[in-house]
């Protein structure tokens, strides 16, 4: 499949697609939520697998990738953009909004507010990438919503890379996840934030490891609802039916395509993204 060039911007209408991107497959968890909430919407998905993991990259690099991908989706005529990556949101969403002030844009951020409201022990755990945990955006969330609770943060190097291979159950990922969960349980966390869009795919495994009293919180459903609000406010809700989702990958497209069925996705034609 040849590289897909950036086209000239198209005037988006109600039936134009929504662009969704992540550093890899993690944003597919958000894509699932969007499909459930907005079944009439046609979707474009770009996995920047050639530059994963974002969580270990510099903010400057992530900003550059965010703007390149935003330009691409804008050129494809997307009527809205979902930054389905916590790290990319923390580093780059403000820059995208500055470039496209009239474009409906939804970002991700760890669910600090609902977690602080849900905890009974007063101790909240956060599983996230290093980039998210070190961001000014995350620090601001803690200052704003978590002043009355204790927050235990746990960076999770290696998890994203394993999930990218479709590995959700192997002994290797079990051992790694157990290592990251144990400090949170030792600190009496009764509410754990999944602060990376890859991590909802590990919910079944986490349920095996955690007491039933521990609540897991992610923001995929909230992002879908926010997208619904923005599209409704702009008069851009689609009447349907939704067209097949189009996928792009900045790595070898066939590799991404083989993983889709493992992550509850219909197999699809994956195109090459080389920018």
Swiss-Prot record:
Gene Ontology terms for molecular function: glutamate racemase activity
Keywords linked to the UniProt accession: Cell shape, Cell wall biogenesis/degradation, Isomerase, Peptidoglycan synthesis
Catalytic activities: L-glutamate = D-glutamate
Positions of the catalytic residues: 85 (proton donor/acceptor), 196 (proton donor/acceptor)
GO terms classed as biological process: cell wall organization; peptidoglycan biosynthetic process; regulation of cell shape
EC numbers: 5.1.1.3
Database matches in InterPro entries: Asp/Glu/hydantoin_racemase, Asp/Glu_race, Asp/Glu_racemase_AS_1, Asp/Glu_racemase_AS_2, Glu_race
Residues that hold substrate according to the record: 22-23, 54-55, 86-87, 197-198
Pathway terms, separated by semicolons: Cell wall biogenesis; peptidoglycan biosynthesis
Disulfide bond positions: none
Principal EC category: isomerase
Matches recorded under PROSITE patterns: ASP_GLU_RACEMASE_1 (PS00923), ASP_GLU_RACEMASE_2 (PS00924)
Family, similarity comment: Belongs to the aspartate/glutamate racemases family.
Function text: Provides the (R)-glutamate required for cell wall biosynthesis.
Protein's name according to its UniProt entry: Glutamate racemase
Organism: Pseudomonas syringae pv. tomato (strain ATCC BAA-871 / DC3000)
Primary gene name: murI
């Amino acid at each position: 499949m040849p590289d897909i060039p950036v086209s000239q911007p198209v005037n988006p209408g109600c039936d134009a697609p929504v662009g969704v991107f992540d550093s890899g497959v993690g944003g597919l968890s958000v894509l699932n939520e969007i499909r459930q909430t907005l079944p009439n919407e046609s979707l474009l998905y770009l996995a920047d697998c050639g530059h994963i993991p974002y969580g270990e990259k510099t903010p400057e690099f992530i900003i550059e990738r965010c703007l390149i991908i935003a330009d691409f989706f804008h050129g494809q005529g997307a009527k809205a953009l979902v930054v389905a990556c916590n790290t990319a949101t923390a580093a780059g969403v403000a820059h995208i909004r500055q470039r496209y002030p009239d474009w409906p844009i939804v970002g991700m951020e760890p669910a600090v507010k609902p977690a602080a409201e849900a905890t009974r022990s007063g101790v909240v755990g956060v599983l996230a990438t290093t980039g998210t945990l070190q961001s000014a955006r995350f620090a601001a969330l803690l200052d704003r919503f978590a002043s009355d609770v204790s927050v235990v943060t746990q960076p999770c190097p290696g998890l994203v890379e394993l999930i990218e291979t479709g590995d959700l159950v192997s002994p290797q990922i079990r051992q790694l996840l157990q290592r990251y969960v144990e400090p949170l349980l030792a600190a009496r966390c009764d509410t754990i934030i999944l602060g990376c869009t890859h991590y909802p795919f590990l919910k079944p495994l986490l349920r095996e490891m955690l007491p039933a009293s521990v609540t897991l919180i992610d923001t995929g459903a909230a992002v879908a609802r926010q997208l619904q609000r923005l599209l409704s406010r702009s008069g851009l809700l689609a009447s349907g039916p939704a067209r097949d989702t189009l996928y792009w990958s900045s790595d070898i497209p066939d590799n991404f395509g083989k993983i889709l069925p493992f992550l509850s996705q219909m197999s699809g034609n994956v195109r090459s993204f080389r920018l």
